[in-house]
Amino acid sequence: MDAQDEDNPFTNLETTVDVTEEIQDWRFLSNVEKDQGTYTIPKRGQKDFEPDGTNKQHSALDLSRKAMFDALSVERLISAKHAIIATWNAQNGMSCVEKAHGPLFKTMGTADSQNRMWLLPEETLYLVERGSMECWSEEGLPMSLQAVYSASIPLCGSLENYLVYAHLRRCGFSVIRSNLVPVKEDEYRCDSKIMNFKDLLFLGLGKASQILQTFNFRKLAFPFSKRRRQSILLHDTFYTYEEVYHDLQIVRGYVPIACNLITSSDSLFQITFHAYKPSASFKKSALSEPDFRICVVSSQDTLLPTIFEIDALFSSTPLRQNMPQHMFQRLKEGYRNIIIAIVDYGVISYIRLSDVCFEEKVYTDFSKKGSKRKRVSKKFQQLV
């Protein structure tokens, strides 16, 4: 989930062309015969770009558009023995599959004593949306995709939760719901808080203090005076380099202590999903430590987390037992890290937050081979 170097848009400006901006030529789909039960994926043809005003281009676009709609209108057929039918249980808020088969159920659903597979709302909606399963009501009526959406989304916690779940599943991850996911059956969108006069007053005073801190009143009063360049160090006399680096530290390093996990149901930032990388040894009955812990938030009703909210989020995450050997990898991942999935009107962005303690004193490590550095004498004085 980390950004790769080849994804950098500035590495090769000549070859970064978005093919989705081009109008596709869908006329090759007209070769698909509707009366056949099996289809083969046809080869892609040439692309038709924006209309240029000519009748030839207009006719080509009409034929391409008609071929696309004709291909979408083809009735998809499936044999009865391969069909997966689920029954929606409104009382439990889950769907039940009597006969589950296929590789998808290796990472989805929970089996009971009667060998029935129970699916969570997001799992049910994902399988119905991708066309792998049909969902029926308890009355024996087939449910449309819109009906499954209306029944499942409130039980998923929010629409953003399902969007992130479906995206991770399409990327190949095995996604397990965390026990901390909030479920709101009636209304799953929080209204924004209305600020009163007291809140506005403190907000104005805070903004005013920030503006005043940016001014240099001494320079405004004496614009032509020359001042001696000051050091960023607090002291003037040092005897070792360790004292210099210790004085330069703004936030002191610390060693994390393993303690009981603290969870808070009031915070907007909570672990929503546990994501696992694709692996043949993955078992739902014996889950290991997840590769990623996902916290889903909406950009429309959620502000930037405060330091207290981030600390509470880290407090609900256990410490890593095996740290990476590479120093920069340890700085990147930290003792614990969380992926914040920000959903902005369907557009998902992932941000990693890591608990990096900076407890390693790299300036005292001179054990590398080939290094000509030596320890400084303790009589080193007057470093400014």
Curated annotation (Swiss-Prot):
Gene Ontology terms: cellular component: mitochondrial membrane; tRNA-intron endonuclease complex
Keyword Transferase applies: no
Start-end of Basic and acidic residues biased regions: 45-55
UniProt record, GO biological process: tRNA-type intron splice site recognition and cleavage
Keyword RNA-binding: no
Disulfide pattern: none
Record keywords: tRNA processing
Location of region: Disordered: 37-57
InterPro entries cross-referenced by the UniProt entry: tRNA_splic_suSen54 (IPR024337), tRNA_splic_suSen54_N (IPR024336)
Transmembrane regions listed in the UniProt entry: none
Family in the record: Belongs to the SEN54 family.
Protein role: Non-catalytic subunit of the tRNA-splicing endonuclease complex, a complex responsible for identification and cleavage of the splice sites in pre-tRNA. It cleaves pre-tRNA at the 5' and 3' splice sites to release the intron. The products are an intron and two tRNA half-molecules bearing 2',3' cyclic phosphate and 5'-OH termini. There are no conserved sequences at the splice sites, but the intron is invariably located at the same site in the gene, placing the splice sites an invariant distance from the constant structural features of the tRNA body.
Subunit structure as annotated in this protein's UniProt entry: tRNA splicing endonuclease is a heterotetramer composed of sen2, sen15, sen34 and sen54. Interacts directly with sen2.
Record's protein name: Probable tRNA-splicing endonuclease subunit sen54
Protein source organism: Schizosaccharomyces pombe (strain 972 / ATCC 24843)
Gene responsible for this protein: sen54
